[in-house]
Amino acid sequence: MVDKDKESPANAYEAAIQYQDRVLERGRTGKIVVRDEDRPWENTRQGRIRYFLNAAMYGDTALQEWRVFSQEIRTQSGKHRHQGGVAIYILDGRGYTVADGKRYDWEKGDLLTLPVKPGGVEHQHFNTNPDGPSRWMAFVYVPLANHVALHLKQLEVAPGHAQARGENND
């Protein structure tokens, strides 16, 4: 985002210094507590997600180097492949993840980790909780994700995504 009231930097070095100053200022003045009610739930290709930290959407927090989101798995997530480097803490429920064809069961209190590996990790998450959706928090350290050339390839969308967006799957 460009602030038209500010003077453009004279060169790349000055632009880098200005960027560092903005990062430091955001660390001093950005939100320390992100309230649940301040972030909306969204229906995405992966399912129902609420982002708490996401620099692409929210520049109001003291930390910008992390992508942190809560996901609710009602039946199953979308299937996709990307570089790993993701830690997922299970908040409620139980289920399993199929990663590169192998099943990994999880439940409340577990930590699911997707490794960084050549070619990425193909995975999909499933809820087996008969009492309702499973829910977790996912943590992605963005500098690492960018360094390993993060790329997401969607293989299947979560149930209900097309209907939520008014799309037709034909």
Q: What are these language model-derived features?
A:
Residues M1-A62, A149-D170:
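A short, N-terminal "cap"/entry segment at the start of jelly-roll beta-barrel domains
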Residues Q76-H82, D105, Q124-T128:
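Short histidine-centered beta-strand/loop micro-motifs
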Residues I88-Y89, T113-L114, N129-A149:
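A short hydrophobic beta-strand segment most commonly corresponding to one strand
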Residues E72, L91, E107, P115, ...:
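Residue-level detector of conserved, well-ordered beta-strand and adjacent loop positions
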Residues D100-G120:
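Short acidic-glycine-tyrosine-enriched beta hairpin
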Residues V68-I73, R81-T97, F139-Y141:
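Short, conserved beta-strand element in jelly-roll/cupin
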Residues R50, E65-H82, P115-G120:
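Conserved short histidine dyad/triad with adjacent acidic residue
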Residues R67, D110, H123-H125:
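Hydrophobic/aromatic beta-strand elements that line small-molecule binding cavities or substrate pockets
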